[in-house]
Amino acid sequence: GVDKMNLLLDDNNFTDEYPSVRDRTIVSLFYATGIRLSELSNLKVQDIDFYNQNIKVTGKRNKERIVPLNQSIVKDLKHYLEKRAEFQSITDTLFLTDKGEKIYNKMVYRIVNKQMSSVLTNKKKSPHVLRHTFATHMLDAGADLNSVKELLGHISIAATQVYTHNTIEKLKKVYKQAHPRA
């Protein structure tokens, strides 16, 4: 749940060294936005709009969408960019390897798996789990399905409905507890 995510992103689990700041920012960005692994790997520094607090994401079939950013991830991104500046990298890719080169999908996957392994007991530990958690937490907190669909970059509502399974189970539980004849 939300508590597990707070535990995962707890500052005490990270140092102020570049790799640690990057890793925390990656996990935090996945949870804050629900973007896909390939979308995160391909982000450019200029895709972040701090003034309007959003990020331009290039999704499947080169479809662009604008995803809002919360205060917490804005703070994380600003701190990360300070650390990233130490590289004076020629690439405009947002996330870099420890050597200052463009990050790649497999490395991002390993980072997320490692961070989740240190805190969570779930069997599955991947960027997609964070995407799923983002969608589930949004729906549980009352976000409408269509808005979540747009945030995730889904073309059809059917693709988004996959994430409502947990929410439906939760509704059944509430119904059984609350309805006089249930």
Feature locations, PLM:
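Conserved catalytic core of the tyrosine transesterase superfamily
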Residues: 1-182
